[in-house]
Design a protein with these regions (language model features):
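N-terminal cysteine/histidine-rich coordination modules
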Residues: 1-62
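Alpha-helix N-cap/N′ positions at the starts of helices
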Residues: 8-12, 69, 85, 97, ...
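A short, Lys/Arg-rich alpha-helix, primarily the initiator
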Residues: 63-88, 130-134
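Catalytic cores of transferase enzymes with a strong primary signal for eukaryotic protein kinases
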Residues: 76-78, 101, 117
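Short alpha-helical "recognition helix" segments of helix-turn-helix
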Residues: 85-95, 102
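Recognition helix of helix-turn-helix/homeodomain-like DNA-binding domains
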Residues: 98-112
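DNA major-groove recognition helix of helix-turn-helix/homeodomain DNA-binding modules
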Residues: 115-133
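Short C-terminal boundary/hinge segments that cap the last helix of small helical domains
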Residues: 127-146
Length: 146
């Protein structure tokens, strides 16, 4: 079992897996979460066992238990932009994230995924911003959306 696994971090609708004999069970976040499910949760969102059997060892729903490095906030990048480029950067970020998520991600209220980090860095570089670090902070967590 994974040490220091906190089931309270598991999203409510995150699909769990009951396949004990799966070759990837020891590193699958879905299986690990199932092992740590609290007794007071009577019904759990669980993958259909027949689907697992039909897959013959291949699982399309495998979710690695490796933690992912998420970025928090990119005000550092936004502040490094010239006045002329700031609006272009903002418009491109809003078209990518959406207006609400742009402001939440900019200030660090929403995590920025690795793919989103690459996009932010590429746009900043296109606009002439070169920094050692483009984000305000980082956090390592399980990627429940993988």
């Amino acid at each position: 079992m994974t040490p220091h696994f906190d089931y309270s971090e598991v999203p409510y609708s995150f699909g769990l897996c009951a396949a004990e004999n799966c070759p990837k069970a020891s590193t699958c976040l879905r299986r690990i979460a199932m092992q740590y499910a609290p007794v007071n949760r009577i019904f759990l969102p669980t993958m259909n066992p027949n689907r697992i059997i039909a897959g013959k060892g291949k699982c399309d729903y495998y979710c690695s238990n490796e933690k992912t490095r998420f970025a928090l906030g990119f005000t550092r990048t936004a502040n490094a932009l010239t006045v002329r480029m700031a609006s272009t950067f903002r418009y491109r970020m809003i078209s990518y994230f959406g207006r609400k998520n742009y402001y939440l991600k900019r200030r660090g209220a929403l995590k920025i995924t690795p793919a989103e980090q690459i996009y932010v860095i590429n746009v900043a570089k296109e606009l002439g911003v070169v920094l050692n670090d483009y984000f305000d902070g980082y956090i390592e967590e399980y990627n429940w959306n993988a």
